Design a protein with these regions (language model features):
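Residue microenvironments linked to proteolytic maturation
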Residues: 12-13, 117-228
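A glycine-rich, hydrophobic loop/mini-helix early in the fold
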Residues: 91-121
Length: 228
């Protein structure tokens, strides 16, 4: 478990999985899924390797607070994104239930999923995705791989219903303070003084607080330094 890997804290990010739909299943869906994902899918001949299901998904959105009240900035995202490669894909955080592996990692635009290069994101202050591509081994769980394929079909009850989630381990963080509903940290006030961070940590959701300061502004945890 990640909690044993010498990090003090963990946070969870999640995102809908987008599969590459085989053309023999539905050629229109196959075309739509290719347009969305082409830049991130591993290069695999799925006709020859019909037991492999290529997938892609956003591991997290950089520079935007997640629902747990945590955020990763551009610098940390760029330092860690390649670490996802060759990691397992699990079902529901069950480490013994590995159904595939991650093979590619890159960046895409927030809201549109258009591929971005390292150069394009390096100086970005606004939100962007860290996007991963990988494979699910259909043979391990046929029912699940069918569900993943159906999740890109708007007429299916499984549409947008399969998510990947990631537990990230870290030991260091600063605080960011935002007003109202704002989730993007480009206009946040950052608190990096260790004494001040410690004084306010009980306000954080990750430590059982309400995520608010006395003046009504919202306080979040910005993950820094090494992330596993």
């Amino acid at each position: 478990n990640i909690k044993n890997m010498k990090t003090k804290y963990t946070t969870i990010f999640s995102s809908h999985i987008k599969p590459l739909v085989p053309e023999d299943k539905d050629k229109y869906l196959a075309l739509a899924s290719m347009v969305d994902l082409e830049g991130f899918l591993p290069k695999i001949d799925t006709e020859e390797n019909y037991d492999l299901l290529p997938i892609a998904f956003n591991a997290f959105v950089a520079n935007r607070v997640n629902k747990n009240g945590d955020v990763v900035d551009t610098e940390t995202a760029m330092a860690m994104y390649k670490n996802f490669i060759n990691k397992p894909v699990n079902i529901e955080h069950n480490r013994k239930s590995v159904i595939g592996t991650i093979l590619t990692a890159g960046f895409s635009s927030f809201g549109e999923d258009k591929p971005l290069t390292e150069e394009e994101v390096r100086d970005m202050k606004g939100p962007f995705n860290v996007t991963l591509g990988g494979l699910v081994w259909k043979i391990i769980d046929k029912e699940l791989s069918d569900k993943i394929e159906n999740s890109s079909d708007p007429t299916s009850e499984d549409y947008m219903n399969v998510s990947a989630s990631w537990e990230l381990g870290f030991s260091d963080y600063n605080l960011v303070v935002l007003e109202g509903e704002e989730k993007n940290i480009e206009n946040a006030t950052e608190i990096s003084d260790p004494k001040e961070v410690e004084r306010l940590q009980d306000k954080l959701r990750g430590f059982g607080g309400e995520g608010k300061l006395e003046d009504g502004t919202f306080v979040y945890r910005k993950v820094i330094n090494k992330v596993i």
